[in-house]
Amino acid sequence: MATGQLFSRNTQALFYNYKQLPIQRMLDFDFLCGRETPSVAGIINPGSEGFQKLFFGQEEIAIPVHAAIEAACAAHPTADVFINFASFRSAAASSMAALKQPTIKVVAIIAEGVPESDTKQLIAYARANNKVIIGPATVGGVQAGAFKIGDTAGTIDNIIQCKLYRPGSVGFVSKSGGMSNEMYNTIARVTDGIYEGIAIGGDVFPGSTLSDHILRFNNIPQIKMVVVLGELGGRDEYSLVEAMKQGKVTKPVVAWVSGTCARLFKSEVQFGHAGAKSGGEMESAQAKNQALQDAGATVPTSFEALEVAIKETFDKLVEEGKVSPIKEVTPPQIPEDLSSAIKSGKVRAPTHIISTISDDRGEEPCYAGVPMSSIIEQGYGVGDVISLLWFKRSLPRYCTKFIEICIMLCADHGPCVSGAHNTIVTARAGKDLVSSLVSGLLTIGPRFGGAIDDAARYFKDACDRNLTPYEFVEGMKKKGIRVPGIGHRIKSRDNRDKRVELLQKFARSNFPAVKYMEYAVQVETYTLSKANNLVLNVDGAIGSLFLDLLAGSGMFTKQEIDEIVQIGYLNGLFVLARSIGLIGHTFDQKRLKQPLYRHPWEDVLYTK
């Protein structure tokens, strides 16, 4: 492995398995370091493509999302680092695919628990092809002021405290990612900070070893000393001992192997990582510390003394003139996310949507304050749910029953009406359910199903002003307005609409008063004197009876009733009801596998 730097200020990575927070932390680090280009060139999210919006400083940027590793590498040939956030189940396969791409030089495997046999294959392939693996079971690595992998070094506040926004003179390598964060802080307190830090990972077989990276550090001129934090278990540290004895490491090394307390236990002990377990004497922390010291490393007597040892070694380099003072720079301020600022009470922001009918922020959704569980447990029906979501109150049972009757009676009226016809033609054209439904719904208007609101408005106005049916009808005629809710293409005096009769029967038996319905019947009596088909239709029946429902329930003010009629609640009832039938017609045509509909010539009057 050896060679030198893995990263630079121009290094870009491909991020596998989209995770918003680690990527945003990488981009915030880039901004903190004054990079001109984001370090994340692209995201690989198997099965999806497009873009992900993230922040680079104060500006939002769109990072491309690719469905496959090969496509991402082809689209971003300068990205030579592959950051793998796949689970331990798929990390090996995706890592091998990345290693086989000629543009990828470094693969960081974050997952813990990758099968050891898979890891061995990855290591063998990487070494044979001169590529570097960091991990598995790693937090990653960082080159101060240049590039960092994923969550390395934690939060922005910690990065600033550790002075990672600019390069120092210390190379650091450890097995533990968590301890690496602590050591970055320690090193920043007693030296000018790190130049590069790597956590090789805690699995038994790391993709690259402590000595691999220290030999690299030895070839990087900017690194003046090395700090190593090992741990009991395994024999990785002995490869470093051999390298030092052979003179391959010429820079001062300060080392400590954690786990000296293992001797206090009578049996074998596992310390967190898969590779950190007490075994034979050679794998003990004491034996490793002694071997490192014998090879020339500075090894303190305890972990607590490690900070002092690092400081003394660094101070000596300064005295010898081998370390030049680093000019401190003030890092830019990372803009705080709006959500974080609001949560902390630092800012206030206006909302963009107001909702009063439902709330999904708790453990269960609430409709107008009524929990979903209560709706089910108390046996609420569709009418009750409509009363909550439309009227924001629980209406009496006769009201919700009337709503349900309206829905049932208006659910469908055969295949020949305009809405059903449109839906059938659309479904037979091979369109999807929503398109077929909408094509039928779009026919609802003044001439088909959409006259309920107008009927209610005109009946209410005339009744409230005590107009006689004659005055009302003739007044509408003078204005050139058809009376909404009156008239039918098929029904007549001798062939009444059964739906209207059922609604009137229910209302007379259950409503406290039916003033508006009686007025509509009086209007019908007058219009029938003009023509046999000017009967009260279902629109007029629902419109007038809904006025009686609103007025008779005692739960609405006059102003609220006027607002309900003005907004268009009643047409909503027909839209909701007829959607049931239109969906049924769509399914019916598709189930029957009906071909594309073409209207017959003989049913068209061609004229000039």
From Swiss-Prot:
Indicate which residues the UniProt annotation says bind CoA: L292, Q293, D294, A295, G296, A297, T298, V299, P300, T301, S302
ATP-binding found in the keyword field: yes
Its family remark reads: Belongs to the succinate/malate CoA ligase alpha subunit family.
What function does the entry list? Answer: ATP citrate-lyase is the primary enzyme responsible for the synthesis of cytosolic acetyl-CoA, used for the elongation of fatty acids and biosynthesis of isoprenoids, flavonoids and malonated derivatives. May supply substrate to the cytosolic acetyl-CoA carboxylase, which generates the malonyl-CoA used for the synthesis of a multitude of compounds, including very long chain fatty acids and flavonoids. Required for normal growth and development and elongation of C18 fatty acids to C20 to C24 fatty acids in seeds.
- What's a GO biological-process term for it? acetyl-CoA biosynthetic process
Protein name, UniProt field: ATP-citrate synthase beta chain protein 1
Q: Which GO terms describe its cellular component?
A: ATP-dependent citrate lyase complex; cytosol
Query: Which residues catalyse the reaction?
Result: H273 (tele-phosphohistidine intermediate)
Record-level Gene Ontology MF annotations? ATP binding; ATP citrate synthase activity; metal ion binding
Q: Which residues take part in binding ATP? A: 214-234, 265-291
SUPFAM superfamilies to which the protein is assigned, alphabetical = Citrate synthase (SSF48256), NAD(P)-binding Rossmann-fold domains (SSF51735)
UniProt binding sites for Mg(2+): E231
Show the taxonomic lineage. Eukaryota, Viridiplantae, Streptophyta, Embryophyta, Tracheophyta
Give the UniProt keywords, A-Z.
Acyltransferase, ATP-binding, Cytoplasm, Lipid biosynthesis, Lipid metabolism, Magnesium, Metal-binding, Nucleotide-binding, Transferase
This protein's species is Arabidopsis thaliana
Q: Which reaction does it catalyse?
A: oxaloacetate + acetyl-CoA + ADP + phosphate = citrate + ATP + CoA
Q: Which residues form the signal peptide?
A: none
From the Swiss-Prot or TrEMBL record, state where the protein is found.
Cytoplasm, Cytosol
What's the top EC group for this one? transferase
Q: What is its EC number?
A: 2.3.3.8
